Structure formats: C-alpha cells, structure tokens
Curated annotation (Swiss-Prot):
Disulfide bonds: none
Protein name: Glycogen synthase 2
Keywords in alphabetical order: Glycogen biosynthesis, Glycosyltransferase, Plasmid, Transferase
Organism from which the protein derives: Rhizobium meliloti (strain 1021) (Ensifer meliloti)
Protein family membership: Belongs to the glycosyltransferase 1 family. Bacterial/plant glycogen synthase subfamily.
Amino acid sequence: MQILSVTAEIFPLVKTGGLADVAGSLPKALRAHGIHTRSFVPGYPGVMRALSDATPVAEFESLFGERATLIAARAHGLDLFVLDAPAFYDRQGALYVDRHGRDYADNWKRFAAFSLVASQIARGLVPNWRPHIIHAHDWHAAMSLLYLKYAGDDTIPRVLTVHNLAFQGQFPAHYFPELGLPAEAYSIDGVEYYGDIGFLKGGLQAADAITVVSPTYAREIMSPAFGMGLEGVMNERHADVVGIVNGIDLEVWDPSSDPCIEHHYSARVPLRRLPNRQVLLRHFGLPDTCGPIFASVNRLTWQKGMDLLAATAGEIVKNGGTLIIHGQGEEKLEAAFMDLMRRFPQNISVSIGYDEHLAHRIHAGADAMLVPSRFEPCGLTQLYALRYGCVPVVARTGGLSETIIDANDAALHAHVATGIQFAPIDEDGLRHALRRTFRLYRLRRVWEGLRRQGMKTDCSWHRSAARYADLYSELLNPDMRLVGSA
C-alpha cells in the first residue's frame, strides 16, 4: 500500500511542535504493516539542505504566480516529495511567522500552493507513482483534500488528521477567487467559515475519514468548550471521526543510547539516571536543593496552561524544589518566567527558545515534567517523560488523561500508576498537584516505583500504527469498519 502523507513539517528535517514528530515517526512504524509512505513537505531551507538522491519530477512555471519544482528525494530514512518554491518557503523567519512573530501575510498562498500540488501528486503527477490514499495533516495540508474533491477524483480515499483544532488556517474571503476552486466551494459544505475562508474546515468537509490524536479529544471536540467553532462540523461528521493516540519513536527517544545525554540508563538500570540530574543542574547554573527538579518543555501559551504554572511556581520554591523552563511563546508569559528567575535565582532557571538536544537532557535529568494544559489533543511531552523516567504531572484533559495513570492510592497499591493527574485545571488544581508530587517524592520507594512503572509503559507506535493500517484498509475495503469507533 502506498500513502501520500502531506505535512508542513517533519522531524528531523524541520519542527515547531508535535506535528513534526508524528509526521516523521509514523511512516517508520507503518512499514511493519507493509505500508510505504512518501511524505510531501515544503522546501524550507532546512529541508533542502538535508536532501539526498534529489531528482526533479515536475516543473511549475506559475504556481500561484511563482516558479516551483517538485523534487523526489530521501533524507534521514524518509522518502520525500519536496516543493522547492523559494518565493514561498525560503524565508528569514520561522516556518509560519516572520522574525517579529507575525504570521506571514501570504500564508494562505504558501499553503494553498502546497495543497494544490499535493492533490496533483495524488492524481498521478509523478510518473510511475500514485498513492492508494492521501493523508493530510492539519490546516496547512487540509486544502489538498478539497482540491482533490473538486477535481472530480473520488478514486483516492482522503484522510485528514487534526493535531490541534485550535489552529485552523482562517483567511479573509477576498482571497477565495485566487484559490482556483469553483464558486460552489465557497459554501457551508466547503471553505466558507463565518464569512471567511477556513482551510481546516474545507479539509474536514472533504475528508472521507478524520482522525484526531486521542479518543478523549475526539469526544471533547464535539462540544463548544473544545470545538473551537467547528463543533457543528465535527458533530455532522462524527461517524467519520476516529481517535488514535500518538506514539513516539523509540529509537530517537531511548535513554539507553541517546546521543543527546551524557549518562545512559534504562528501566532495568534506573540508578544510572542519577548523574544526569547533576549535569542538568550544572547546565542551568542551579544548586542541588535535594528537592525534586520540576521541568516544563512546552510552548509558553495560555493553551498550555503556562500562566497557571507562573502563578504557582512559588509553591515549588517554598517547598525546596527547583523549576526549569524551556520553551517560547507569548511575550507576556516569557516575561513572567524571566521575572521569576530573577526573583528566585537559586530555584528557577528559564531558557527561552527550543533546542532538541536540550529537551532530551531535561527529560533525562528532571524528576517531574509539568504539563498543565487547558486542553491537549494528545501531547507528546508526557510520553517522552515516561520513557525517560521523569514523572509526568498533567492536567486531566484530552490525551493526557488517557496516557497517564494517576498515582491515587488504588493505582499505587496495584503498581500501575505512572504519573499525577489534576483537575480542575486552574491554579488551585495545579497547586494541589504540586503538593502531591512533593509528598510522593519524599516517599522514596514509592517515587522510584512510580518512575520505573512509567519507564515500562509502551509509548511506541505499535498499537496506533496498527489502527492507522486498519483505517487505511477500511477505506480501500468499505466492508470493514473502524471509522466512528473512537
């Protein structure tokens, strides 16, 4: 089976978040099911530099007014199609925003062009290659399904994965005539969205199957509280929605061989983890208070609940703990954490930005990973934390509630607990969770059991890749049934 995976980012070539990790690791997991994936990505500078065996397969004289080349290539074990369009993707800023953090004004055009070419690949643009299924990820790629639908080609099943419904690709309606779609596409059954254009909404309407990244999130997004204005569409399509929890790449995230960390260890030899704690403290210039090291490797945003953490950080300091923050996001929150570091230089350290190697070292050295998200479709940080023996402290929402077993008395007695959940998701809820963490940390035997149980958890793609394989088979063989079984 051949799959065309359409994604705006893919690890290890280019990454801003969990989308890249999933897009990079799922194809590897699907190989065990006899499924070959070619991933189609924009030709950002980081992508172009990494390519090997690059061969031009199609030329575009005027793709939304710009010259472009479609390239077939390989990189880091991934089979790729790359849209080399310097006018769209060779930018000085980040993937979606400029150096000042503002969305590129032509994002609508950048990803409409990308989606249009994806639909053409699905229809046979590349000689001697055509997919059995097109699988688009998030709003950047969602329009590929709509272009394919309005091309009149219903022979290729269309799958859309929504990694976060909050990111929708919404643009002014006056761009619609430039999209190259028929007039009827600007309708409630197409891209029209509250008087604007909705790229994600258009993809949701055109998809044969919609996956989201956990069964809990699949249920949550049917409600106004989590539907982000799309709950009506999601309810209309509920029979075609399936929740599949993300996995992680166990080769990239393996504490027994990770080149990013100094001291290797595993669930069988967990004591070898201890020196990584001192390495981490030295890196951040912090003394060892002998209390737990709390960490957060996250976007500094309201969605991620980082304002709750900023408001409760004093609880960590008061109880003799240490807090390490690594991430970037809203200026107000960045400033709040920098202020906390100035106030408590012996207990709090903050690193604004994102560095993949440092993220690995933090997971290997910290005692507890804080994930206080107000909503979280799946989350990967808590899975990395489990794998690395860093106890997750998570809000009870979305995929967090499915992947972490709370350390209540019954779960601890049964030796199945893997972390700490909290609700309600507010300052008091998080503060209570921090106090629970301190209490458990002081019970050394209990804490080490919690850590070991987490490390034994299967965070791989094994089960989830099988679910995707079943979904693909169902779409090609309609007598089967998986969709709607969230």
